[in-house]
């Protein structure tokens, strides 16, 4: 398995940023290396708070990297070269700009939209302290406070709120995402 970070792999359009078409262009090179599978690091729309792991839309290509047509052409070229395509799905969290998190912020505490994430009331007389002392992998508290006083969990950057895997909506959303990419030629 050959991991590719599309943003830095090969720039076809000359904008200084690697792109999906660049992966397609280098398919013969990958085949000649003996690669039998490529693993694409996140290439989804993102504000790049964490190198693309802060995903805004799991079912699209970041427009800076290309289009869905570019992705489909890349998957087809890979398969013609005998190379499988694996995409990096990030199921721990979304970006804070993901539609689900925006709905959660607009919703009341305890609502179904909030339940897609891990929201908690804070400690202290006025809830001014995080729910616990957990630390983010990036340093600092793993909790961020929102305008209504509740806190949400982010084990990574605060732009990456953790999803609640006890919520069936999250299961369904990621099943839809996996089906989507399977329908677009991915092998894993």
Descriptions of predicted regions:
Residues 1-175, 179, 183:
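Acidic/aromatic-lined carbohydrate-recognition and catalytic surfaces
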Residues 187:
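Receiver (REC) domain switch/active-site residues of two-component response regulators
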């Amino acid at each position: 398995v050959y991991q590719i970070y599309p943003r830095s792999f090969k720039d076809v359009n000359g904008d200084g940023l690697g792109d999906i078409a660049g992966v397609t262009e280098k398919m013969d090179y990958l085949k000649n290396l003996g690669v039998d599978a490529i693993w694409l690091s996140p290439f989804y729309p993102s504000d790049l708070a964490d190198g693309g792991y802060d995903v805004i839309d799991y079912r699209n290509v970041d427009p800076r990297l290309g289009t869905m047509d570019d992705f489909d052409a890349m998957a087809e070229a890979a398969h013609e070269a005998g190379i499988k395509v694996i995409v990096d799905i990030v199921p721990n969290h979304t970006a804070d700009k993901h539609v689900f998190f925006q709905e959660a912020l607009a919703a009341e505490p305890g609502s179904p939209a909030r339940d897609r994430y891990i929201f908690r009331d804070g400690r202290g007389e006025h809830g001014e302290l995080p729910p616990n002392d957990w630390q983010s992998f990036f340093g600092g508290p793993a909790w961020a406070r929102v305008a209504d006083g509740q806190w949400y969990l982010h084990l990574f950057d605060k732009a990456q709120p953790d999803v609640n895997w006890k919520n069936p909506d999250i299961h369904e959303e990621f099943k839809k995402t996996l089906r989507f990419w399977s329908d677009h030629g991915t092998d894993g």
